[in-house]
């Protein structure tokens, strides 16, 4: 019996699950294939920050794409809870990007003065900053406050998207290896897997840092590379920080239950997920230098994730020029959680022939 779908999605991280969710909502027959379990790699490791201004500089197209995606989260969280019953722990707690040098002060003050229309961004002097976050180090020179930024639980988001996809008619096959792509002339017609052959009008590769290995089999030279990031979490009694704190080389994300997630190192061009003492020592040094009370925190755990980066530094969301019936969505690097909602919409629009998003051409190039 031929197993035919409208779309096959290869990759069960947050990007693949977001695409499956959007396509299932539109009544498409979708199969998502994951070689491990959902949210098993970068989506499991991510801190879940929704930081537009802290992660993306300037007022370019990718910034506006990220802002649009961030603003989708309140309704997405509600929809996922109603459909799947799962809470993605979305909070709009705001984010503060710290300045520690005079050069950083000038840069952030200028950023605040040039904030895009409608974006609530403001500079906080040291006194104002300490009234917001009194436990920060008194050596901090001020901060850029972005009240609309927030965070989610990245694993729960991915799992909720997957569950909601299934409840809307999609199928998900975990622990399934993709052996090869099936072809007819210059068109991809499906995939050959450890659980059989599956056919579809469109195959979407959304395998994160591993996407390039899949594309290599088709002669598609996708220029991307992996970046390892190490993180750790601690528990503190009460709240020593209300908002996400971001500074060069380190972020501190408050979560439910007194947990703080702290990350992340950057080790490019490696798939080795080993956690190093050097990486953790550097993070601990940076984190305690801006939030001294962390020295008394209770250690919880450490982990590492592999993030996909492109040579152009922007994600790729679009069709293959070489193969009909093949689309690609990867390269989101540190912004996979932030960009997941809009990526799902863009890719679902693309498959339906609606290349109407004004930023679509930019992120595909």
Model-inferred region functions:
Residues 5-32:
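N-terminal Rossmann-like FAD-binding beta1-loop-alpha1 element of flavoenzymes
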Residues 49-132, 286-288:
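Dinucleotide-binding Rossmann-like beta1-alpha1 core, especially the glycine-rich loop
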């Amino acid at each position: 019996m031929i197993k035919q779908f409208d779309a096959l999605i290869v990759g069960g991280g947050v990007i693949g699950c977001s695409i499956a969710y959007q396509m299932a909502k539109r009544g498409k027959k979708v199969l998502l294939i994951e070689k491990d379990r959902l949210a098993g790699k970068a989506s499991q490791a991510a801190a879940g920050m929704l930081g537009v201004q802290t992660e993306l500089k300037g007022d370019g197209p990718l910034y506006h794409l990220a802002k649009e995606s961030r603003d989708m989260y309140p309704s997405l969280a509600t929809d996922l809870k109603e459909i799947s019953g799962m809470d993605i722990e979305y909070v709009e707690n705001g984010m503060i990007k710290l300045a520690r040098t005079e050069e950083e002060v000038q840069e952030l003050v200028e950023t605040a003065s040039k904030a895009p229309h409608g974006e609530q961004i403001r500079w906080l002097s040291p006194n104002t900053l300490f009234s917001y976050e009194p436990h920060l180090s008194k050596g901090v020179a001020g901060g850029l406050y972005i009240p609309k930024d927030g965070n989610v639980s990245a694993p729960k988001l991915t799992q909720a998207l997957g569950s909601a996809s299934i409840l809307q008619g999609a199928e998900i096959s975990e622990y399934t290896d993709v052996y090869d792509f099936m072809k007819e002339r210059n068109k991809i017609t499906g995939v050959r897997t450890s659980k059989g052959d599956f056919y579809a009008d469109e195959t979407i590769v959304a395998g994160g840092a591993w996407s390039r290995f899949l594309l290599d089999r088709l002669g598609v030279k996708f220029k991307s590379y992996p970046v390892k990031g190490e993180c750790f979490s601690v528990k503190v009694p009460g709240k020593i920080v209300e908002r996400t704190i971001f500074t060069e080389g380190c972020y501190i994300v408050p979560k439910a239950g007194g947990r703080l997630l702290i990350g992340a190192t950057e080790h490019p061009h490696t798939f080795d997920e080993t956690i190093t003492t050097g990486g953790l020592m550097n993070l601990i040094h940076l984190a305690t230098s801006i939030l001294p009370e962390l020295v008394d925190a209770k250690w919880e755990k450490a982990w590492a994730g592999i993030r996909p980066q492109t040579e152009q530094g922007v994600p790729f969301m679009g069709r293959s020029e070489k193969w009909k019936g093949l689309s690609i969505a990867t390269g989101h690097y540190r912004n996979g959680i932030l960009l997941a909602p809009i990526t799902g919409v863009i890719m679902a629009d693309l498959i339906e022939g609606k290349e109407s998003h004004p930023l679509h051409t930019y992120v595909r190039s």
